[in-house]
Amino acid sequence: HNIVSEYMSTLSHMNMETIELSFFGGSFTGIPMQEQKDFLSIAKKYKESGLIQKIHLSTRPDYINEEILDNLKAYSVDVIELGVQSFAQPVLDASCRGHDTACVYESCAKIKEYGFTLGIQLMIGLPMDTWEYDIFSAREAAKIHPEIARLYPTVVIRDTGLFQLMEQGLYTPMGEKDAVER
């Protein structure tokens, strides 16, 4: 609450049409439900007071279900971005994502069915990824018609599954030049 209040005070002199309170940098709906409610209750108060116009979050496809969507709807969430990463099953498997492409399609459909704005995040350079898989994923994302689409290069973070694969010599991250060219 204090962080949001402090940040909001810096915006008073700006002429901004839409101010969003966003929960990024992780899988929001993967945290315990009570913690989600605690964060969202603060965001909802800001929205109801008119200080913000939208509540925005990112999560994983396998952290979407009807209970979660009902909760997000109750707290007036507007935008859900899914870290889809890839629509190619071999890439999801090699990256140890823990879900299949059916889960991705189902989650996207449910989010749209509930009336949320859908964002799809794709990631290039994951294990087993190829130019062809990237094009396939981009086309599949376009077929779903998300309102937001983001494309990220893979960044390996210490103490993750990708980091372990890299340490074992089983995965080599894409270099900056290749990421830009792709």
Residue ranges and their predicted role:
Residues 27, 59-61, 86:
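Short, flexible loop/turn elements at secondary-structure junctions
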Residues 33, 40, 44-47, 56, ...:
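C-terminal scaffold of the Radical SAM
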Residues 1-22, 31-55, 66-67:
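Conserved alpha-helical substructure of the radical SAM core
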Residues 24-27, 152:
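Glycine-rich beta-strand-to-loop/alpha-helix junction loops that act as flexible
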